Amino acid sequence: GRGMKMKMEKEEKMTTADPKATKETVELWNYLHAVAGKQIITGQHTQTIPCEEIAYIRQTTGKEPKLRGFELLGYSPNINYADASPECLTEIEENKGTAEMALQWAIEQRKNGNGGILTFTFHWFSPLGGRDKSFYTEHTDFDAREVLKEGTPERAAFYHDMDVIAEILRRFQEERIPILWRPFHESYGTWFWWGAQGPEVARNLYHLMFDYYTCLLYTSPSPRD
């Protein structure tokens, strides 16, 4: 009927939110859109650098997941090592170098024509510090609502950390490797600082990051330029 036709036309017009998305990003988006509701993409998050989960799957099935996930928590600029539990320190240590490993894996997948898909999760330690695993609400006094206000320490710290992570992600952009970027995960709950103040605040944090990461910023070395 007419309603189904309109729905199909709407689906056909779906595209990336960033009109300047790279060719590789658009190709990944089109692939995900094409398999949606028809196929299942198997994936596995890697908990540590050795990627023992992948080795187990390979040994058991003779195959590897098409999608592989990595964690960026070790790149948080404000980890309080002096007040971190042994568990926290172990988790940080086990995730050091994940970006480099992910980049190497993605390049190899492209070289071999395997079409691997890369996704990143970021357990973001509080931009203003805290105790132990300060991405947990109970371990930080960081108020995400303050990020949405101009001129606050929270906002400055938020943007500082985004700059740090942007430099990591830039390596993948230079290699033209798209990423399924997963910041502010589980924001429907209150256990992480980015979700502690409710879904609207979490949504606005995402919008800030999206705008900041997709807008082209130009700086000149000379006032005359």
What is the predicted role of each segment?
Residues 41-43, 66-71, 117-121, 179-183:
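Structural recognition of the beta-strand scaffold that forms the well-ordered cores
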